[in-house]
Amino acid sequence: MAATYSFDVVSDFDWQELVNAVDQTEREIKSRYDLKDTKTTVELAKEGITINTDSEFTLDAIQTILQTKAAKRNLSLKIFDYGKVESVSGNRVQQVIKLRKGIDSEIGKEISKLIRTDFKKVQPSIQGDAVRVSAKSKDDLQEVIQRLKQEDWPIALQFTNYR
């Protein structure tokens, strides 16, 4: 019996949970006394989240609210890639937060290299924005998952298609 088992290492997030986190952030901004009159906007688009507010202090408070709401919805904070704070018209500040999705080739190569050096019986292969890991033993795959979880990656990793 020469069956091989595999799983995919991906970096993804639940879009609906992100929509809910942004919606809850907007509701809290409207209800909090210190943020009510700041005319803050939090806009969600496919490429990222744009926060427009009156000061950097308020921007920090809104980032904290967004992070709290995202964490409560089981979203990793590593999906947020904070851009620089820009001054816009009328003494206002704006920040674009890009959303990280998918494993880029550089991080994919690092994951592959780590697996190849630590586990001789396991074969990693980069497939687009995911890394497929295959082996003849399910136990080897479980060890790979545990090892990858121990590392501090700059992106959020999920393990899918475990077969």
Swiss-Prot record:
Keyword Nucleotide-binding: yes
NCBIfam families the UniProt entry points to: PRK05412.1
Gene Ontology cellular component list: cytosol
Protein name in UniProt: Nucleotide-binding protein Cyan7425_1379
Function of the molecule: Nucleotide-binding protein.
Any Pfam family hit: DUF520
Residue stretches in coiled coil: none
Highest taxon of the lineage: Bacteria
Family: Belongs to the YajQ family.
Keyword flag Cell wall biogenesis/degradation: no
Swiss-Prot/TrEMBL keywords: Nucleotide-binding
